[in-house]
Amino acid sequence: MEFPKKAEIIAVGSELLLGQIANTNAQFISKQLAEIGVNVFYHTAVGDNPERLKQVIRIAEERSDFIIFSGGLGPTKDDLTKETIANTLGRPLVLNDEAFQSIEDYFKRTKRTMSPNNRKQALVIEGSDVLANHFGMAPGMLTEHESRYYMLLPGPPSELRPMFENEAKPLLLKKMGSNEKIVSTVLRFFGIGESQLEADLEDIIDAQTNPTIAPLAADGEVTLRLTAKHADEKETERLLKETEAVILERVGEFFYGYDDTSLVKELSIACKEKGITISAAESFTGGLFSEWLTDHSGASKLFAGGVVCYTNDVKQNVLGVKKETLDRFGAVSKECASELAKGVQKLTGSDIGISFTGVAGPDAQEGHEPGHVFIGISANGKEEVHEFHFAGSRTGIRKRGAKYGCHLILKLLEQK
Protein backbone atom coordinates (compact mmCIF):
# COMPACT_ATOMS: atom_id res chain seq x y z
CA MET A 1 0.00 0.00 0.00
CA GLU A 2 1.09 3.59 -0.57
CA PHE A 3 2.48 5.10 2.60
CA PRO A 4 -0.06 7.48 4.19
CA LYS A 5 0.57 11.19 4.40
CA LYS A 6 -2.07 12.37 6.92
CA ALA A 7 -0.64 11.86 10.38
CA GLU A 8 -1.99 12.40 13.88
CA ILE A 9 -0.06 12.25 17.15
CA ILE A 10 -1.80 11.01 20.29
CA ALA A 11 0.05 11.56 23.55
CA VAL A 12 -1.15 9.24 26.31
CA GLY A 13 -0.74 10.12 29.98
CA SER A 14 -2.81 11.79 32.68
CA GLU A 15 0.25 13.78 33.73
CA LEU A 16 -0.01 15.71 30.45
CA LEU A 17 -3.60 16.74 31.14
CA LEU A 18 -2.73 17.74 34.70
CA GLY A 19 0.00 20.05 33.42
CA GLN A 20 2.69 18.14 35.31
CA ILE A 21 4.83 17.74 32.18
CA ALA A 22 4.91 19.39 28.76
CA ASN A 23 4.17 17.44 25.59
CA THR A 24 7.60 17.87 23.99
CA ASN A 25 7.30 14.49 22.24
CA ALA A 26 4.62 15.76 19.84
CA GLN A 27 6.81 18.69 18.83
CA PHE A 28 9.79 16.41 18.22
CA ILE A 29 7.83 13.83 16.22
CA SER A 30 6.17 16.53 14.10
CA LYS A 31 9.55 17.97 13.14
CA GLN A 32 10.94 14.55 12.31
CA LEU A 33 7.95 13.64 10.14
CA ALA A 34 8.03 16.98 8.32
CA GLU A 35 11.61 16.23 7.29
CA ILE A 36 10.48 13.12 5.41
CA GLY A 37 7.38 14.67 3.87
CA VAL A 38 4.70 13.37 6.24
CA ASN A 39 2.19 16.03 7.28
CA VAL A 40 0.88 16.09 10.86
CA PHE A 41 -2.63 17.56 11.01
CA TYR A 42 -3.64 16.86 14.60
CA HIS A 43 -2.13 16.69 18.09
CA THR A 44 -4.24 15.01 20.76
CA ALA A 45 -3.63 14.28 24.43
CA VAL A 46 -5.63 11.76 26.45
CA GLY A 47 -5.37 10.42 29.99
CA ASP A 48 -4.66 6.88 31.15
CA ASN A 49 -8.21 5.70 30.58
CA PRO A 50 -8.95 2.89 28.09
CA GLU A 51 -12.47 4.05 27.19
CA ARG A 52 -11.39 7.61 26.44
CA LEU A 53 -8.37 6.30 24.52
CA LYS A 54 -10.72 4.16 22.40
CA GLN A 55 -12.83 7.24 21.66
CA VAL A 56 -9.74 9.18 20.61
CA ILE A 57 -8.60 6.30 18.37
CA ARG A 58 -12.01 6.16 16.64
CA ILE A 59 -11.91 9.92 16.00
CA ALA A 60 -8.35 9.68 14.67
CA GLU A 61 -9.24 6.82 12.32
CA GLU A 62 -11.91 8.98 10.68
CA ARG A 63 -9.44 11.70 9.70
CA SER A 64 -5.92 10.23 9.68
CA ASP A 65 -4.20 7.30 8.04
CA PHE A 66 -1.04 7.32 10.17
CA ILE A 67 -1.57 7.46 13.94
CA ILE A 68 1.39 7.80 16.28
CA PHE A 69 1.05 7.13 20.00
CA SER A 70 3.53 8.16 22.68
CA GLY A 71 3.40 6.86 26.24
CA GLY A 72 1.58 4.10 28.08
CA LEU A 73 4.00 1.25 27.28
CA GLY A 74 5.30 0.81 30.83
CA PRO A 75 4.77 -2.09 33.28
CA THR A 76 2.11 -0.55 35.55
CA LYS A 77 -1.66 -1.05 35.49
CA ASP A 78 -2.33 2.40 34.03
CA ASP A 79 0.01 1.73 31.07
CA LEU A 80 -2.75 0.55 28.74
CA THR A 81 -1.89 2.01 25.32
CA LYS A 82 -0.72 -1.25 23.78
CA GLU A 83 -3.59 -3.32 25.17
CA THR A 84 -6.22 -0.79 24.12
CA ILE A 85 -4.92 -0.49 20.54
CA ALA A 86 -4.57 -4.28 20.19
CA ASN A 87 -8.16 -4.67 21.39
CA THR A 88 -9.38 -1.97 18.99
CA LEU A 89 -7.64 -3.64 16.04
CA GLY A 90 -8.69 -7.14 17.07
CA ARG A 91 -5.08 -8.29 17.23
CA PRO A 92 -3.49 -10.37 20.01
CA LEU A 93 -0.40 -9.34 21.95
CA VAL A 94 2.55 -11.70 21.57
CA LEU A 95 5.87 -11.92 23.39
CA ASN A 96 8.84 -10.47 21.52
CA ASP A 97 11.80 -12.66 22.42
CA GLU A 98 14.47 -10.03 21.76
CA ALA A 99 12.74 -7.44 23.90
CA PHE A 100 12.17 -9.96 26.70
CA GLN A 101 15.82 -11.01 26.63
CA SER A 102 16.89 -7.37 26.78
CA ILE A 103 14.70 -6.80 29.86
CA GLU A 104 16.05 -9.93 31.57
CA ASP A 105 19.63 -8.86 30.83
CA TYR A 106 18.95 -5.43 32.35
CA PHE A 107 17.76 -6.90 35.65
CA LYS A 108 20.68 -9.32 35.79
CA ARG A 109 23.12 -6.52 35.07
CA THR A 110 21.68 -4.29 37.80
CA LYS A 111 21.28 -7.22 40.24
CA ARG A 112 17.58 -6.51 40.68
CA THR A 113 14.61 -8.87 40.77
CA MET A 114 12.41 -8.79 37.69
CA SER A 115 8.69 -8.57 38.51
CA PRO A 116 5.98 -10.32 36.44
CA ASN A 117 4.78 -6.88 35.32
CA ASN A 118 8.01 -6.31 33.39
CA ARG A 119 7.15 -9.20 31.07
CA LYS A 120 4.25 -7.06 29.90
CA GLN A 121 6.72 -4.57 28.42
CA ALA A 122 7.99 -7.21 25.97
CA LEU A 123 4.54 -7.81 24.47
CA VAL A 124 3.90 -6.43 20.97
CA ILE A 125 0.87 -6.36 18.69
CA GLU A 126 0.96 -9.42 16.44
CA GLY A 127 2.33 -8.69 12.96
CA SER A 128 4.10 -5.47 13.96
CA ASP A 129 7.51 -4.25 12.92
CA VAL A 130 9.31 -3.99 16.27
CA LEU A 131 11.35 -0.89 17.13
CA ALA A 132 14.21 -1.75 19.47
CA ASN A 133 14.61 0.32 22.63
CA HIS A 134 18.32 0.77 23.43
CA PHE A 135 17.67 3.29 26.21
CA GLY A 136 14.83 1.61 28.11
CA MET A 137 12.80 -1.58 28.30
CA ALA A 138 9.58 -1.26 26.29
CA PRO A 139 10.00 -1.70 22.52
CA GLY A 140 8.05 0.41 20.08
CA MET A 141 6.20 -0.95 17.08
CA LEU A 142 4.66 -0.10 13.71
CA THR A 143 1.45 -1.93 12.83
CA GLU A 144 -0.37 -1.89 9.48
CA HIS A 145 -4.12 -2.47 9.64
CA GLU A 146 -6.84 -1.75 7.08
CA SER A 147 -4.98 0.91 5.07
CA ARG A 148 -3.64 2.65 8.18
CA TYR A 149 -0.42 2.62 10.12
CA TYR A 150 -0.27 2.70 13.91
CA MET A 151 3.04 3.53 15.57
CA LEU A 152 3.56 3.05 19.30
CA LEU A 153 6.46 4.81 21.02
CA PRO A 154 7.55 5.03 24.68
CA GLY A 155 6.74 8.17 26.67
CA PRO A 156 10.13 9.19 28.14
CA PRO A 157 11.84 11.55 25.65
CA SER A 158 15.21 9.93 26.43
CA GLU A 159 13.81 6.71 24.96
CA LEU A 160 11.45 8.08 22.30
CA ARG A 161 13.91 10.38 20.53
CA PRO A 162 16.70 7.87 19.80
CA MET A 163 14.12 5.21 18.95
CA PHE A 164 12.46 7.48 16.41
CA GLU A 165 15.70 8.70 14.84
CA ASN A 166 17.49 5.33 14.73
CA GLU A 167 14.65 2.83 14.35
CA ALA A 168 11.37 4.44 13.28
CA LYS A 169 12.57 6.98 10.73
CA PRO A 170 14.67 4.51 8.67
CA LEU A 171 11.75 2.05 8.72
CA LEU A 172 9.31 4.74 7.55
CA LEU A 173 11.63 5.74 4.71
CA LYS A 174 11.85 2.09 3.67
CA LYS A 175 8.06 1.77 3.73
CA MET A 176 7.84 4.93 1.63
CA GLY A 177 10.21 3.40 -0.92
CA SER A 178 12.73 6.19 -0.48
CA ASN A 179 16.48 5.67 -0.75
CA GLU A 180 17.21 9.30 0.00
CA LYS A 181 19.67 10.20 2.74
CA ILE A 182 18.29 12.87 5.06
CA VAL A 183 20.83 15.02 6.89
CA SER A 184 20.15 17.94 9.23
CA THR A 185 22.33 20.55 10.82
CA VAL A 186 21.43 23.32 13.25
CA LEU A 187 22.97 26.80 13.02
CA ARG A 188 22.92 28.70 16.32
CA PHE A 189 22.71 32.51 16.58
CA PHE A 190 22.83 34.98 19.46
CA GLY A 191 22.45 38.76 19.61
CA ILE A 192 19.77 38.94 16.92
CA GLY A 193 16.02 38.47 17.29
CA GLU A 194 14.02 35.89 15.35
CA SER A 195 12.05 38.53 13.42
CA GLN A 196 15.23 40.34 12.35
CA LEU A 197 16.95 37.10 11.35
CA GLU A 198 13.95 36.05 9.27
CA ALA A 199 13.77 39.50 7.67
CA ASP A 200 17.45 39.31 6.71
CA LEU A 201 16.92 35.84 5.22
CA GLU A 202 13.36 36.31 3.92
CA ASP A 203 14.08 35.50 0.27
CA ILE A 204 16.10 32.41 1.17
CA ILE A 205 13.42 31.09 3.54
CA ASP A 206 10.60 31.82 1.06
CA ALA A 207 12.43 29.99 -1.72
CA GLN A 208 13.40 26.96 0.37
CA THR A 209 12.90 23.54 -1.16
CA ASN A 210 15.96 21.40 -0.56
CA PRO A 211 17.34 22.06 2.01
CA THR A 212 14.39 23.17 4.09
CA ILE A 213 14.98 25.92 6.67
CA ALA A 214 13.17 25.93 10.01
CA PRO A 215 13.75 28.90 12.37
CA LEU A 216 13.15 28.59 16.10
CA ALA A 217 13.62 31.10 18.93
CA ALA A 218 14.14 30.05 22.55
CA ASP A 219 15.91 31.46 25.62
CA GLY A 220 17.15 34.54 23.79
CA GLU A 221 18.72 32.53 20.98
CA VAL A 222 17.66 31.72 17.44
CA THR A 223 18.37 28.48 15.61
CA LEU A 224 17.99 27.50 11.98
CA ARG A 225 17.57 23.80 11.25
CA LEU A 226 18.69 22.99 7.70
CA THR A 227 17.51 19.64 6.35
CA ALA A 228 18.60 18.27 2.99
CA LYS A 229 17.85 14.98 1.26
CA HIS A 230 19.40 13.22 -1.71
CA ALA A 231 20.20 9.67 -2.77
CA ASP A 232 23.90 10.59 -2.72
CA GLU A 233 25.03 11.47 0.81
CA LYS A 234 27.86 13.64 -0.51
CA GLU A 235 25.35 15.65 -2.53
CA THR A 236 23.24 16.05 0.61
CA GLU A 237 26.24 17.49 2.45
CA ARG A 238 26.97 19.80 -0.49
CA LEU A 239 23.42 21.16 -0.46
CA LEU A 240 23.70 21.91 3.26
CA LYS A 241 27.08 23.62 3.00
CA GLU A 242 25.95 25.71 0.04
CA THR A 243 22.88 27.03 1.87
CA GLU A 244 24.83 27.53 5.09
CA ALA A 245 27.40 29.66 3.26
CA VAL A 246 24.70 31.95 1.85
CA ILE A 247 23.10 32.34 5.28
CA LEU A 248 26.36 33.07 7.10
CA GLU A 249 27.36 35.61 4.46
CA ARG A 250 24.39 37.70 5.64
CA VAL A 251 24.13 37.02 9.38
CA GLY A 252 27.46 35.40 10.20
CA GLU A 253 28.33 37.99 12.84
CA PHE A 254 25.63 36.49 15.10
CA PHE A 255 26.53 32.83 14.45
CA TYR A 256 28.33 30.95 17.19
CA GLY A 257 28.03 27.19 16.64
CA TYR A 258 26.31 24.06 15.42
CA ASP A 259 23.75 21.54 16.65
CA ASP A 260 23.71 20.94 20.43
CA THR A 261 26.49 23.31 21.42
CA SER A 262 25.92 26.33 23.70
CA LEU A 263 27.44 29.75 24.22
CA VAL A 264 29.20 28.67 27.40
CA LYS A 265 30.55 25.52 25.75
CA GLU A 266 31.95 27.54 22.84
CA LEU A 267 33.44 30.04 25.30
CA SER A 268 35.12 27.25 27.25
CA ILE A 269 36.61 25.79 24.07
CA ALA A 270 37.86 29.17 22.85
CA CYS A 271 39.47 30.04 26.20
CA LYS A 272 41.25 26.70 26.45
CA GLU A 273 42.52 26.94 22.87
CA LYS A 274 43.91 30.43 23.46
CA GLY A 275 45.06 29.87 27.05
CA ILE A 276 42.80 32.65 28.36
CA THR A 277 41.51 32.88 31.93
CA ILE A 278 38.31 34.63 33.07
CA SER A 279 37.07 36.01 36.38
CA ALA A 280 33.62 37.38 37.18
CA ALA A 281 32.08 39.97 39.49
CA GLU A 282 28.37 39.22 39.60
CA SER A 283 25.60 41.30 41.10
CA PHE A 284 22.22 40.78 39.37
CA THR A 285 23.28 37.41 37.89
CA GLY A 286 24.00 36.11 41.40
CA GLY A 287 26.79 33.73 40.37
CA LEU A 288 24.96 32.23 37.38
CA PHE A 289 27.74 33.04 34.90
CA SER A 290 30.33 31.43 37.20
CA GLU A 291 28.10 28.40 37.70
CA TRP A 292 27.78 27.87 33.95
CA LEU A 293 31.52 28.09 33.38
CA THR A 294 32.29 25.62 36.16
CA ASP A 295 29.66 23.13 34.93
CA HIS A 296 32.15 21.99 32.29
CA SER A 297 35.10 19.71 32.99
CA GLY A 298 38.50 21.38 33.00
CA ALA A 299 36.99 24.67 34.19
CA SER A 300 40.03 25.41 36.36
CA LYS A 301 42.05 25.97 33.18
CA LEU A 302 39.90 28.93 32.18
CA PHE A 303 38.04 30.18 35.26
CA ALA A 304 40.20 32.00 37.81
CA GLY A 305 37.40 32.79 40.24
CA GLY A 306 34.29 34.83 40.91
CA VAL A 307 32.73 37.16 43.46
CA VAL A 308 28.99 37.56 44.02
CA CYS A 309 28.84 41.23 44.97
CA TYR A 310 25.24 41.97 45.87
CA THR A 311 26.00 44.64 48.45
CA ASN A 312 27.88 47.89 47.98
CA ASP A 313 30.16 46.90 50.88
CA VAL A 314 31.44 43.91 48.91
CA LYS A 315 31.76 46.01 45.77
CA GLN A 316 33.93 48.48 47.70
CA ASN A 317 35.86 46.36 50.17
CA VAL A 318 36.49 43.26 48.05
CA LEU A 319 36.57 44.56 44.49
CA GLY A 320 37.81 48.11 45.01
CA VAL A 321 34.90 50.11 43.60
CA LYS A 322 35.36 53.70 44.75
CA LYS A 323 32.87 55.09 47.26
CA GLU A 324 32.63 58.23 45.16
CA THR A 325 31.57 56.12 42.16
CA LEU A 326 28.75 54.51 44.10
CA ASP A 327 27.66 57.79 45.66
CA ARG A 328 27.64 59.70 42.39
CA PHE A 329 26.54 57.10 39.82
CA GLY A 330 25.08 54.25 41.87
CA ALA A 331 25.65 50.50 41.66
CA VAL A 332 23.61 50.26 38.45
CA SER A 333 25.89 52.29 36.19
CA LYS A 334 28.54 51.92 33.53
CA GLU A 335 31.08 53.45 35.91
CA CYS A 336 30.44 50.80 38.55
CA ALA A 337 30.47 48.01 35.93
CA SER A 338 33.85 49.21 34.67
CA GLU A 339 35.42 49.29 38.14
CA LEU A 340 33.95 45.89 39.05
CA ALA A 341 35.44 44.25 35.95
CA LYS A 342 38.82 45.84 36.58
CA GLY A 343 38.68 44.95 40.27
CA VAL A 344 37.93 41.25 39.82
CA GLN A 345 40.57 40.95 37.10
CA LYS A 346 43.15 42.47 39.45
CA LEU A 347 41.99 40.37 42.41
CA THR A 348 42.31 37.05 40.56
CA GLY A 349 45.07 37.84 38.08
CA SER A 350 42.93 36.65 35.18
CA ASP A 351 43.33 37.69 31.55
CA ILE A 352 39.73 38.91 31.35
CA GLY A 353 37.48 40.29 34.07
CA ILE A 354 33.74 40.54 33.48
CA SER A 355 31.11 42.24 35.63
CA PHE A 356 27.33 42.12 35.80
CA THR A 357 25.42 44.89 37.55
CA GLY A 358 21.78 45.84 37.06
CA VAL A 359 18.21 45.20 38.10
CA ALA A 360 16.80 41.68 37.73
CA GLY A 361 13.43 42.69 39.16
CA PRO A 362 10.64 42.46 39.90
CA ASP A 363 11.03 45.87 41.56
CA ALA A 364 12.85 48.94 40.30
CA GLN A 365 16.13 49.95 41.94
CA GLU A 366 17.86 53.34 42.14
CA GLY A 367 15.38 54.62 39.56
CA HIS A 368 16.22 51.83 37.10
CA GLU A 369 13.52 49.53 35.76
CA PRO A 370 13.90 45.72 35.83
CA GLY A 371 16.04 44.56 32.93
CA HIS A 372 18.29 47.64 32.87
CA VAL A 373 21.77 46.14 33.19
CA PHE A 374 25.43 46.87 32.50
CA ILE A 375 28.08 44.30 31.59
CA GLY A 376 31.69 45.40 31.92
CA ILE A 377 34.80 43.75 30.51
CA SER A 378 38.39 44.44 31.51
CA ALA A 379 41.13 43.06 29.26
CA ASN A 380 44.43 44.18 27.76
CA GLY A 381 44.55 47.23 30.05
CA LYS A 382 41.20 48.53 28.78
CA GLU A 383 37.65 48.50 30.06
CA GLU A 384 34.47 48.46 27.99
CA VAL A 385 30.88 48.53 29.20
CA HIS A 386 27.73 47.40 27.39
CA GLU A 387 24.27 48.60 28.40
CA PHE A 388 21.13 46.50 27.86
CA HIS A 389 17.41 46.72 28.51
CA PHE A 390 16.06 43.18 28.87
CA ALA A 391 12.44 42.14 29.24
CA GLY A 392 11.04 39.16 31.08
CA SER A 393 11.04 37.53 34.48
CA ARG A 394 13.78 37.81 37.10
CA THR A 395 15.11 34.41 36.09
CA GLY A 396 14.94 35.29 32.40
CA ILE A 397 16.84 38.55 32.90
CA ARG A 398 19.57 36.77 34.87
CA LYS A 399 19.92 34.13 32.15
CA ARG A 400 19.95 36.72 29.37
CA GLY A 401 22.69 38.65 31.18
CA ALA A 402 24.86 35.56 31.66
CA LYS A 403 24.42 34.60 28.00
CA TYR A 404 25.39 38.07 26.83
CA GLY A 405 28.47 37.80 29.02
CA CYS A 406 29.51 34.65 27.13
CA HIS A 407 28.68 36.31 23.81
CA LEU A 408 30.71 39.46 24.52
CA ILE A 409 33.81 37.55 25.59
CA LEU A 410 33.54 35.29 22.53
CA LYS A 411 33.45 38.37 20.30
CA LEU A 412 36.49 39.75 22.13
CA LEU A 413 38.41 36.50 21.63
CA GLU A 414 37.60 36.51 17.91
CA GLN A 415 39.66 39.70 17.64
CA LYS A 416 42.72 38.10 19.25
From Swiss-Prot:
Organism classification: Bacteria, Bacillati, Bacillota, Bacilli, Bacillales
PANTHER family assigned: NICOTINAMIDE-NUCLEOTIDE AMIDOHYDROLASE PNCC (PTHR13939), NMN AMIDOHYDROLASE-LIKE PROTEIN YFAY (PTHR13939:SF0)
Organism: Bacillus subtilis (strain 168)
Listed SUPFAM superfamilies: CinA-like, Molybdenum cofactor biosynthesis proteins
Domain of life: Bacteria
Stretches of the chain forming a coiled coil according to its record: none
Record family assignment: Belongs to the CinA family.
Protein name per the record: Putative competence-damage inducible protein
InterPro entries: CinA, CinA-like_C, CinA_C, CinA_KH, Competence-induced_CinA, MoaB/Mog-like_dom_sf, MoaB/Mog_dom
Annotated Pfam families: CinA, CinA_KH, MoCF_biosynth
